[in-house]
């Protein structure tokens, strides 16, 4: 996806990003149901096959999620894509961690901008919604992206099924 975005002038329409990322979200819903977290979702880990089919790569950072979908993990940081809980080794991670990262991928794909780092956002949140940037996207999509990028994990979607539904309301 990173290379594709580079070729497309750094961003694509919401509709095209939805076509690319919906299958990835469905895959991640299944991954989470199996008790795994990816923990490294970013454009450079989404490969577009010649037929346009997206594939999620690099499960090297993935971990089993114990204790009702939550556990502690070593640091895995990708600036702009890592949620606050990945910066603190004592914080719990779960599906909400991957949801934040998917929100960041959507944001990057449609705005052409990598979201500010979560640590920077926790001091003064400079994140501007896609609609506020003047992009022509559905309000549901704008709300869903911003909800996924919420700094508080409890205010994000609980799972990818919920996130998909949020985009479709």
Model features per residue range: what roles?
Residues 2-12:
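AlphaC helix of the protein kinase catalytic domain
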Residues 80-169:
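C-terminal lobe helix-coil module of Hanks-type protein kinase domains
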Residues 37, 42-43, 47:
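Canonical protein kinase catalytic loop motif
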Residues 48-52:
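Activation-loop N-terminal segment of eukaryotic-like protein kinases
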Residues 54, 66-76:
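Regulatory activation segment
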Residues 20-21:
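Activation segment signature within eukaryotic-like protein kinase domains
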Residues 25-36:
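Protein kinase catalytic-loop region centered on the HRD/HxD motif
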């Amino acid at each position: 996806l990173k290379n594709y975005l580079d070729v497309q002038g750094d961003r694509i329409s919401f509709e095209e990003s939805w076509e690319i990322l919906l299958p990835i979200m469905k895959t991640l819903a299944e991954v989470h149901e199996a008790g795994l977290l990816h923990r490294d979702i970013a454009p450079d880990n989404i490969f577009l096959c010649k037929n346009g089919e997206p594939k999620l790569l690099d499960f090297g950072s993935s971990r089993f999620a114990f204790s009702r979908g939550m556990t502690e993990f070593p640091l895995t940081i990708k600036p702009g894509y890592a949620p606050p809980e990945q910066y603190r080794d004592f914080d719990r991670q779960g599906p909400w961690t991957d949801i934040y990262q998917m929100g960041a991928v959507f944001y990057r794909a449609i705005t052409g901008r990598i979201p500010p780092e979560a640590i920077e956002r926790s001091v003064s949140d400079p994140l501007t919604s896609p609609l506020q940037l003047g992009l022509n996207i559905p309000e549901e999509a704008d709300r869903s992206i911003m909800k996924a990028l919420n700094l508080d994990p409890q205010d994000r979607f609980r799972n990818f099924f919920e996130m998909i539904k949020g985009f479709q309301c």
